Amino acid sequence: MWRLPAFAVGCSQVVLPGEQPALVRNYDYDQALFEAVIASTDYSGRRRVLGTSDMLWGLLDGMNEDGLAVSLTFGGRPDVGEGFGIPIVLRYVLETCATVEQAVSALRRIPVSQSYNVALVDSAGHHATVFVAPGQPAEVSELHATTNHRLDQVEHPTHAARFNSVGRLSRLDELRTGDPSGRQLVAAMLAPPVRNDQFEVGFGTLYTAEYQPAAGVATWHWLETSWTRGFDDPDDIREVRLA
């Protein structure tokens, strides 16, 4: 996964730190390019990982049994450079890191091929959002919510406007000021303007993932159903309607 072809669209993510930390994210993409696999793995034999698979062994989001959760959103820049594809970077972080501090250190040193906002939270309630881009140092922030521009800075207004990046972020920031519960946040993520239904142009919300690293469980939400998984759950299948 080195210097992958450019791919982008949407996604929204929010970190809830504190005593019961959570990471909630919407994945907005082309349904035809989605693997629709939730992978529970123990590749190293030392650290189990649970997350949404991409490119067979990469991850779009996930959590490990140490209590570290991670997800991504496209960072708004169209350029591609020398570096690893972000799915394998997220896999590496969850395979090798136990805390937000360790994950930030890893993201500082790993070159990436495109720009992304990477949200992190651990079971101790520590959090960070890291903007990574090809050819530049990682930018570390304490932002709780990000959509599809560089942290809270719009660099490419046309793309941001096309996918309502600012509008979605404004809604997430508004929610954050009300100190929402995880349930309230999930409900908002499943409703406009955060949820998207432009499936015909590859901009539909394929799932809302809710990671609870202290509890060791993750739940994938859709309009009509939810599916909670833990590290010890057996293989299973769910069929869902996206719209």
Where are the predicted features?
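C-terminal, well-structured catalytic/ligand-binding subdomain of enzymes
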Residues: 1, 17-243
